[in-house]
């Protein structure tokens, strides 16, 4: 059975160029997998400028060659599996990473790619993290947590293309590429 991974890369943008951090394999770095990252393949169009004249049929509307798309919000579901001794620090490290508050952070702007969905977006940022974080069972030595994170996708159209590299026969993502 194939395990589909989610990759996140911290970004910063100075108005001219992007600075990129390392690509984080969530499973390897934080012991977290994503069970749902519902990117929109076809986002909603922005409202176009128009005038509605009372004495005329229809409206005057400006229709550009490419209709611009709206940003949108999504709620992703993450699952953690570790031990009771590490659950708090692992999830805190993950949340700090998402907010760009970790050590050596590049920024809170993110590029995200989900292998299961087969797509990703850039200029993603966190809006909130669910406070109902985890559930531990006394009978199970593993700590399992499910929690939700709300993201804003500010660039709803730029495709992310993962750049894979083979390390000892195992594919890993080296960079999340996109055109600007």
Task: Give the label of every model feature segment.
Residues 1-180:
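Extracellular/virion structural assembly segments
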